[in-house]
């Protein structure tokens, strides 16, 4: 007997689905494809953290201490740029070929990184790897939307959040183990067999999913180039600010000014071309706009907590690096579990706004408590404050993936999904740069503990903004099939 995912709907609706090219998907194919998707997401998330602990050893091995931070920067910039382009092209040419292509590119680039003989080669190969990661992540996260209708998608998005958190926890540990054991090259080479398995699974079991046809499509080369010209200098400058450079120095102000000019050009181009990389009309949908705003602010807040809680522990409470890791572990586990549970709950309720408001309120409360810490704060109090903040963030972040996909027209589903991650990457870079500036400025005048409190107040302010914006978030029922209801989406 064939096992299929059944969607209860009227006969005329079923007929409409057939006319539009949508059909029931085989359960086994969906489950195995989802396994391949999770492999892709795990590899992409792991690669962001596994390198960190190996960087000093890599720099020593390749005799290039002065430029080793570029190994991270090149990867981040390339993956950010590739996200919207990969999302758009997957909307037009299909998710399967871009998921497999992105994974294959990632695997080849990983092998090249593992074989690099100079730091220049490694930086170049890391940039290539970032391009593959961006395409892979855009296609993988949108494939979930193709496999599951919004009413069933919450559980899968929760699983993705859990996989990402697990990768972030495992990454530094695995990176240290491989670096101290077989050698730093294996932090890249380990991706090769895992990625090949993912490619084979997706190639073999990806179900036949038709998509709305895009007639006479032409690649928006001018839009793509102007977007790259805008994103690259801005992200590069933000990374330099995070390393301690001044905002008003020529090396920062000029790239940011140039990037803003290119972004303005990009927006003007996208408004005029027939097939834009990022359709500007998409942002007229208030659900998408508010969800993207909140997604970016939430990620900036999460990065702030992840980076500056360990600093408070070690520099103010005089904890060891090991103790800092032990305190952050419950925070990470909380996020993984609550994100998964939230995905299940949204699917059961078919609603999201109340949960998002509740999560934002909890996160604001946790950040408020963090902002009131002092050298007399106990480690247990810091742990509880951090876990409370993580609990709230874990409730809201998966929701905004779902709200964007639920509100997006099927013809721009890949672009809309990729924009969630694009906004998160850019927001986290801006957040780290701003936090670093606050820390540097306030430490000179008031000391480190007070400066960290100022950072936490900024994080609390971001989360208050998320709460207020969520109050204006229009709630529409989660669709029960991947057939568009045009009236609901406009």
Report the location of each language-model feature.
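C-terminal membrane-cytosol helix-exit motif in multi-pass small-molecule transporters
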Residues: 192-211, 228-240, 258-273, 466-474
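Membrane-interface helix caps and helix-loop-helix hairpins in membrane proteins
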Residues: 119, 213-214, 241-247, 375-376
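Structural detector for helix-capping/boundary residues
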Residues: 96, 125-126, 151, 219-222, ...
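Short juxtamembrane and helix-loop transition motifs at transmembrane-helix boundaries
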Residues: 148-154, 182-186, 212-218, 317-322
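12-transmembrane solute porter fold
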Residues: 32-46, 51-53, 66, 72-74, ...
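Membrane-interface "helix-start" segments
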Residues: 215-227
């Amino acid at each position: 007997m064939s096992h299929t995912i059944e969607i209860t709907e009227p006969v005329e609706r079923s007929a409409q689905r057939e006319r539009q090219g949508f059909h029931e998907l085989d359960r086994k194919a969906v489950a195995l494809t989802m396994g391949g998707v999770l492999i892709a997401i795990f590899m992409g998330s792991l690669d962001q953290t596994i390198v960190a602990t190996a960087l000093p050893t890599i720099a020593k091995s390749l005799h290039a201490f002065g430029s080793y931070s570029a190994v991270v920067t090149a990867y981040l910039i390339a993956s950010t740029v590739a996200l919207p382009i990969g999302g758009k092209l997957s909307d037009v040419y299909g998710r399967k070929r871009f998921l497999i292509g992105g994974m294959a590119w990632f695997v080849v680039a990983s092998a090249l990184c593992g074989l690099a003989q100079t730091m220049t080669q490694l930086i170049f190969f890391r940039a290539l790897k970032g391009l593959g990661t961006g395409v892979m992540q855009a296609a993988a996260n949108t494939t979930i939307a193709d496999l599951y209708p919004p009413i069933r998608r919450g559980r899968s998005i929760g699983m993705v959040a859990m996989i990402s958190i697990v990768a972030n926890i495992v990454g530094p540990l695995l990176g240290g183990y491989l670096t101290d054991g077989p050698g730093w090259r294996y932090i890249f080479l380990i991706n090769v067999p895992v990625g090949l398995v993912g490619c084979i699974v997706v190639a073999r079991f990806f179900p036949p999913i038709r998509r709305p046809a895009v007639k006479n499509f032409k690649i928006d080369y001018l839009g793509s180039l102007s977007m790259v010209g805008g994103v690259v200098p801005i992200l590069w400058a933000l990374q330099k600010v995070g390393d301690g450079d001044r905002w008003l120095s020529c090396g920062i102000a000029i790239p940011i000014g140039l990037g803003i000019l290119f972004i303005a050009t990009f927006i003007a181009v996208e408004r005029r071309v027939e097939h834009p990389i990022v359709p500007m009309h998409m942002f007229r949908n208030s659900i998408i706009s508010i969800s993207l705003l909140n997604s970016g602010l939430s990620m900036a807040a999460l990065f702030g907590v992840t980076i500056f809680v360990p600093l408070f522990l070690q520099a103010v409470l005089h904890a060891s690096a090991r103790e800092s890791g032990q305190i952050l572990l419950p925070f990470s586990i909380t996020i993984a579990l609550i994100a998964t549970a939230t995905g299940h709950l949204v699917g059961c309720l078919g609603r999201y706004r109340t949960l998002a408001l509740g999560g934002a309120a909890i996160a604001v409360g946790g950040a408020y408590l963090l902002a009131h810490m002092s050298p007399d704060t106990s480690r247990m109090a810091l742990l509880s404050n951090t876990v409370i903040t993580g609990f709230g963030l874990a409730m809201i972040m998966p929701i905004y993936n779902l709200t964007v996909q639920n509100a997006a027209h099927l013809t721009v589903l890949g672009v809309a999904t990729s924009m969630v991650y694009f906004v998160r990457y850019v927001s986290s870079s801006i957040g780290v740069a701003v936090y670093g500036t606050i820390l540097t400025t306030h430490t000179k005048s008031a000391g480190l503990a007070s400066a960290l409190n100022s950072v936490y107040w900024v994080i609390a302010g971001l989360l208050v903004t998320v709460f207020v914006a969520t109050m204006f978030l229009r709630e529409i029922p989660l669709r029960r099939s991947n057939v568009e209801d045009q009236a609901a989406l406009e």
